[in-house]
Amino acid sequence: MNRIFLILFSLLSFVGFSQNPPLKHVTWNAVYVATNATGGEIHFTATIDKKWHIYSQRPTDVGPIPTSFTVTPSADFELVGKVEEEQAHEEYVAAFEAKVFVFSNQAVFKQKIKLKNQKSFTIKTSLEFMTCNDVQCLPPATLEFQVLVPEGGAKK
């Protein structure tokens, strides 16, 4: 009898779990913005649910995975400097028993690029980030983007 109950409980748990969508508390987008006559920036924007946050790019030795970006090299452009982030705020995170830099509500990261031609092309990028609230952290996630640079992608 106990065995039947255990099997039934396991099956019902699996069915119930499989119907719930995965937790998703951050929505990202990546776009190219022309800023000058020779190039522009890739803007990575995160929209973050209330009571959730993501971490700054600043590495820490206390636990959270910092947000990181990868841009696949191409003959069409060159990176100028590193990815810059808008102001993160410092917050005590009980899960790590430390103060860390986080973003709440929205985060914007920018990577400057110099165009090597004026044709249309796509920039392949990826980012890794970790989402947490006051109770739990979700496993780190990696997203990939194809960012379109239109023909004549520099600002006139």
Show which residues each predicted segment covers:
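Extracellular/lumen-exposed scaffold segments
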Residues: 19-156
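Sec-dependent N-terminal signal peptides
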Residues: 4-14
